[in-house]
Amino acid sequence: MNEIREQYETTQFIVVKYGDEQYGVDIKYVDNIVRMQRITRVPKVQSYIKGVINLRGEVIPVISLRLKMGLDEDVITKATRIIIIKLETNECIGVLVDEVKEVVTLENAMIEKVAYDSKDPRANFVSGVGKERDGLISLLDIPGTFAEKEA
């Protein structure tokens, strides 16, 4: 009986785009989505850490997930957003995304685990793939992606 219930349980994801690829961020980790704003650079940090922003009096580090995943440099456009991720430790991290597309609800049965080649930069960042009407969505592993302290 529990297996049947789990099969029909759902999870909501915010779909974001990096170029032509779609990624899903589990909505339980999303604290806020803000327009691109001035990022203050911080010296002597990893190249994927873009700097910090001041969001309602709170200083939040902002990272380029593109660079962390080994993709090309971010191109800032009018559609660029910063997703504020709230980690299980209650710390917040801003993540640059090319575009926030929509919120989708996926049945757990529509999510498949994937095994990337260890040389694929996405191997450490994607926990599975969700099947959706517009195609496939690579689901980001938020706890795994931010397991190390960013700033």
Regions from the language model: what does each represent?
Residues 1-151:
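An acidic, low-aromatic, low-complexity terminal/linker signal
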